[in-house]
Amino acid sequence: MSVPIDRERLVETASSMIDVHSFTGDEQKMGELMVSLYEGMGLAVQWQQVEENRANALGTLAGTGGGPTLMFNGHMDTSYSGREPWLKDVPGFQPKAFVEEGRLYGLGISNMKGALACYVEAVRALQDAGVRLRGDLLIAAVCGEIEKTQYGDAQGAQYRGYAAGSRYLVTHGGVADMCLLGEPTEGKVVLGHFGALWLRIRVHGNFIHTAFSEGKKDQNSILRMHEVLAAVQEWIPTWEGDPSNAYRGAQAIVNVGAIEGGFGWRVSRTPHHSDLFLDVRVPPTKAMGVARREVLDFVRSLAQRFPDYGVEGEVYVTAPGAEIDEGHELVRAVDEAHEQVFGSKPERDVTRWFSDASALSRYGIPTLNYGTSTGLMDVERGENLEIDGLVRTAQTYALVAQRICG
């Protein structure tokens, strides 16, 4: 049964979420907002204090019994703080909601406070229509999903992402028979996504004063890294083109994400080492242990090719991909609900970004990514979503809940 969505209430809810700053590591107040929403809806509330100033907020609409439990999962942390020099003057990347020409703007609206608002409004719509579900319906608002990790001097909660909240969730009672994850998928059904392996490659060199470096440039680790980087660029197409690294027609991809060497405050010294950082995307069909072995074998080949450079490798992120069987009942439910609301069946997709489906699926919770658009393409106005799209997405979620929970 299709239930009406209160457009104004949905916009108000989403706006209240945007207005709460919730950069990774600072999600507490957003969690408190979710709790107040749950309590206003009469949901059972579970508060999970993940660490200081970080929490998960779980709300449960209890069923009458005998039906499957469905989880709506969404992360509260935003990809940016809005204080970055290149974003501070872009209005849609600030934690202040505003509406223009049928679109809702503000930091986090697409990734993924819009989905959280749709979950809330879907449950409210079911309640307003007097729908009683047999199975439990959970809303899990979690911290720490954004793709980042502690490394070197970058320490603290703001760097603890990669499903930190959902890993805590599933080990402290936040489990279900299946999960709908409203990441921004452009309304497509994502049957699987790649995982991420982060690799550091280090090259060593001499640490000497500029005055004594004449004739020793071949011992400068930055200049040595120039050669190693060229070898890495030769290797990247072999990883991306390897059939074992492809998934459902999508190739793997490797990003040269960072390079570090020397001291900007002391360039009177040659750098004793330089580091290159790679983001290597791994298909969900390849075990991370296998991927780790393969990339470190490549590092060993570099060490053999450049025997005087002291080449080393370290894998410091292994975040597996995830997939769901196309025949799963949740996929069928989303197909049917989407077609009812949008007038056609949703397209299939594979993505190379990471999501909390990685943690959830490994805890025995089949998880499907399906949500709104990315909303990140307006470089002048910033992050935004079409309000009509939010309304229809909330309506789709409500239909999915009825089909799954009974």
Question: Residue spans of the language-model regions?
Answer:
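Acidic-glycine-rich active-site phosphate/pyrophosphate-binding loop
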Residues: R83-E100, G192-V203, A333-A337, L368
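Short beta-strand segments
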Residues: N73-H75, A140-V142, L180-E183, R202, ...
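Structural motif
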Residues: P68-L70, G102-R103, L137-L138, D177-L180, ...
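Metal-dependent amide/peptide-bond hydrolase catalytic core
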Residues: M1-E8, D26, R200-G406
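Generic structural signal for helix capping and beta-alpha/helix-loop junctions
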Residues: A55, S79, C143, E147-T149, ...
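Acidic/His- and Gly-rich active-site-bordering loop/insert found
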Residues: S2-I109, D128-R134
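Acidic/histidine-rich catalytic neighborhood of metal-dependent amide-processing enzymes
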Residues: M112-F194, C405
